[in-house]
Amino acid sequence: MATISSTLLLNSSRSALPLRFPKFSGFSSSSPFARSYRFGRRNLEPLSNGMLSSGSRADGATAAAASMEGVMTEAMKLIQSASPTWKSAVANNLLIFVLGSPLLVTGLSASGIAAAFLLGTLTWRAYGSAGFLLVAAYFVIGTAATKVKMTQKEAQGVAEKRKGRRGPRSVIGSSAAGCVCAFLSIYQVGGAAFSQLFRLGFVSSFCTKVSDTVSSEIGKAYGKTTYLATTFKIVPRGTEGAMSLEGTLAGLLASFFLASVGCFLGQITPPEAAVCVLASQIANLGESIIGASFQDKEGFKWLNNDVVNVINISLGSIVAILMQQFILQNWVK
């Protein structure tokens, strides 16, 4: 494993004050954290040259240097933590959110980012960097699909509000089932026997949601003919409970891709990835039927998109867990 070290020289008229960044061993120089560290170092060093022009500034810089060194040491220790803790989860999440803020603001409102930060912290605490990367992949895919043909969607009145920037209710509605699985994993409910089931439910919930988002957004952008899930009657794009061939295929591919990411990251096995894809399609069909049958109907005004999202991803998680227990487990044996 590589060692990361650097020396930052703060020059003044009185003296040159060396600030030595701590040596961090135990993680690869090619890791995202190492690259981020080097990026920050390269940008700090030029700014430091000539920064100090008086003795008083030099004295202040000495204290600041010592403080910065302590903060950096503690932060990198948390990042390298083998077993995720709440402290390491917050530190890692904060670092990634700062570096990824240009992307985050394109897909989330300010309050949505706050909700996503809580989700990211919980995910890292439960499943470490692998779980976090899975959720990040979901966010990138979903945001990209939402932006497809945005002008056309807005003209037709079927685009997401705020140029597709999701708020806190959308974030919570899209991650509720995953959060439940994460909490159950953190506190080891049911012991080791249930640990992988909760992990499977977590992955399946996001496979379900990414499939739902992509199928909806691509269907609104490219769907040639849109059918109501309950009657197969042709309806306008954007109708609740409507489906299109183009959107359905895109959603299936998105679910397959995210399940493959989960498999690659070691969160699930290949057979479990197949379960996630199948469960996501079953859940999305169920959501379409619910939307077509009840949403926007008299007596069901409470059944808005956020509530339907919770039902959808919960179905995806539950179906995947049941399939694992009653079908896949027996088939593997």
Swiss-Prot record:
Protein name: Protein VTE6, chloroplastic
Compartment(s): Plastid, Chloroplast membrane
Family listed: Belongs to the TMEM19 family.
Presence of the UniProt keyword Cell membrane in the record: no
Keyword Phosphoprotein attributed: no
Note from the entry: Overexpression of VTE6 results in increased phytyl-PP and tocopherol levels in seeds.
Cystine pairs: none
The organism of origin for this protein: Arabidopsis thaliana
GO cellular component terms listed in the entry, alphabetical order: chloroplast membrane
Entry EC no(s): 2.7.4.-
Class in the EC hierarchy, top level: transferase
Transmembrane stretches, start-end: 94-114, 126-146, 171-191, 248-268, 274-294, 307-327
GO term, biological process aspect, one: phytol metabolic process
Originating gene: VTE6
Membrane topology type: Multi-pass membrane protein
Reaction catalyzed: phytyl phosphate + a ribonucleoside 5'-triphosphate = phytyl diphosphate + a ribonucleoside 5'-diphosphate; phytyl phosphate + CTP = phytyl diphosphate + CDP
Main location: plastid
Keywords, ordered alphabetically: Chloroplast, Membrane, Plastid, Transferase, Transit peptide, Transmembrane, Transmembrane helix
